[in-house]
């Protein structure tokens, strides 16, 4: 199960990033600036609908994503068959803690069978309450998830060191 993939996180505040020799990323986000970093790292992640799960009992939302590794340079010793650059994607897990509600907007009917392209995680204002926030996950084509949370507490962890891809995401502005 997805929930069994997570271990304990060392206590502390702020952004914590570690890279092991296999180049896998492990990051904890605790504030809005950290959330921006997580959003940048997850931009263009491909997520199967079946790989997202809200555990209301444990107040967490979990995702397994195939993220494009924007933070890594192209693979220097490798070209694709046309001589083009080769990039990397890594399988990663994302756990958003203290989630008390999930709201779907423009969500696909057959969402469990869908593959969604994550564009960004954004912090939205909390409507007239003394604590908490809303974290919005925006996907290509308009679907989004709004997670009501007690605080920003996100863990992102690569499961592997990455795999080559010759497809770099592009966006029309």
Give the positions of each predicted feature.
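Extreme N-terminal basic, low-complexity initiation segments
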Residues: 2-8
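Intrinsic, low-complexity N-terminal interaction/targeting segments
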Residues: 32-44, 101-137, 145, 149, ...
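Flexible glycine-rich active-site/ligand-binding loops centered on an Asp-His dyad
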Residues: 150-173
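Short, low-complexity cationic-aromatic patches
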Residues: 49-62, 125-140
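Short, surface-exposed beta-strand/loop "edge" segments at domain boundaries and coil↔beta transitions
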Residues: 69-76, 141-149
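Short, well-structured hydrophobic secondary-structure segments
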Residues: 44-103
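Eukaryotic intrinsically disordered, low-complexity regulatory linkers and tails enriched in Ser/Thr/Pro
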Residues: 6, 14-44, 62, 112-114, ...
């Amino acid at each position: 199960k997805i929930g069994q993939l997570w271990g304990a996180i060392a206590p502390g505040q702020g952004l914590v990033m570690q890279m092991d020799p296999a180049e896998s990323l492990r990051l904890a986000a605790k504030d809005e600036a950290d959330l921006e970093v997580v959003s940048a790292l997850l931009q263009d992640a491909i997520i199967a609908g079946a790989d997202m799960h809200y555990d209301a009992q444990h107040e967490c939302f979990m995702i397994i994503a195939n993220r494009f590794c924007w933070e890594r340079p192209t693979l220097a010793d490798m070209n694709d068959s046309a001589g083009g650059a080769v990039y990397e994607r890594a399988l990663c897990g994302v756990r958003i803690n203290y989630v008390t509600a999930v709201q779907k907007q423009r969500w696909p009917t057959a969402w469990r069978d869908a593959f969604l392209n994550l564009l960004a995680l954004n912090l939205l204002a909390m409507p007239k309450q003394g604590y908490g926030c809303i974290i919005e996950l925006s996907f290509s084509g308009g679907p989004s998830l709004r997670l009501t949370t007690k605080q920003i507490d996100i863990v992102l962890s690569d499961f592997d060191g990455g795999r080559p891809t010759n497809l770099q995401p592009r966006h029309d502005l």
